[in-house]
Amino acid sequence: MQPDRDTLLAGAQALGCPLSDTQADALLAYLGLLQRWNQVYNLTAIRDPKQMLVQHLLDSLAVIAPLNRVAGSAPLRLLDVGSGGGLPGVVIAVLRPDCQITCVDTVAKKATFIRQVTAELRLPQLVARHARVEQLTDGPYSVITARAFASLADLVKLTRPLLAPGGCWMAMKGQHPQAEIDALDADINVFHVEQLSVPGLDAERRLVWMRPRSVASS
């Protein structure tokens, strides 16, 4: 596991979120759980451990520095929509233990897996929900995020009732989603589209930040 640990530590450092030993241990334990469960429950199409580390852990770690910059260091409530195996929700929970994080997915086995992660990694602030996001009533959330979930317009439509006043959406995308941005309602302000560089990943990554225009910065 040492090469994986070195890759993780170096990647996190390059992403501006250096890991403590405890955080690195937790993320590698999570990766091990994901690999074991994936053999039976098909949580992710990626099966190679090294690819999992880059395409799941480092890809999710790439949002930590931007999240800290935009949302600040104060505790917040975050909703991870279509979380799958807990990405990026579990990774954020490890790096931001002060935050209350809810991972929601329509697939029961994925929610069950996240509950197992919560228990084994001792992350009491991480909650898994097996539900459609539009069925949730436990908002509001300061930040709503999604990775490979749906179009920006659908994300906003399904989750807007759950967004706290002054809150924002943080959508993880690949190439610059100009067509999706153009399809948003006029009252949604895309206040930043950030290009991410994930160590070891030869693919484009963008982080799209949105908020209702009524609270957009002038």
UniProtKB/Swiss-Prot annotation:
Q: Which terms in the GO cellular component ontology are assigned?
A: cytosol
Catalytic reaction list = guanosine(527) in 16S rRNA + S-adenosyl-L-methionine = N(7)-methylguanosine(527) in 16S rRNA + S-adenosyl-L-homocysteine
UniProt-listed CDD domains? AdoMet_MTases (cd02440)
On whether rRNA processing is a keyword of this UniProt record, the answer is yes
Tell me, what is one Gene Ontology molecular-function annotation carried by this entry?
rRNA (guanine-N7-)-methyltransferase activity
What keyword terms does UniProt attach to this protein? Cytoplasm, Methyltransferase, rRNA processing, S-adenosyl-L-methionine, Transferase
Principal localisation: cytoplasm
Q: E.C. number, please?
A: 2.1.1.170
Q: Where in the cell is it found?
A: Cytoplasm
So where does S-adenosyl-L-methionine get bound?
A: G82, L87, V133, E134, R147
Enzyme class of the recorded protein, top EC level: transferase
> Which SUPFAM superfamilies does this UniProt record tie to the protein?
S-adenosyl-L-methionine-dependent methyltransferases (SSF53335)
Q: Does the keyword Transmembrane helix apply?
A: no
Q: Name one Pfam family in it.
A: GidB
According to the lineage, what is the superkingdom? Bacteria
The function of this protein is: Specifically methylates the N7 position of guanine in position 527 of 16S rRNA.
Q: Which family does it belong to?
A: Belongs to the methyltransferase superfamily. RNA methyltransferase RsmG family.
This protein is called what?
Ribosomal RNA small subunit methyltransferase G
The encoding gene: rsmG
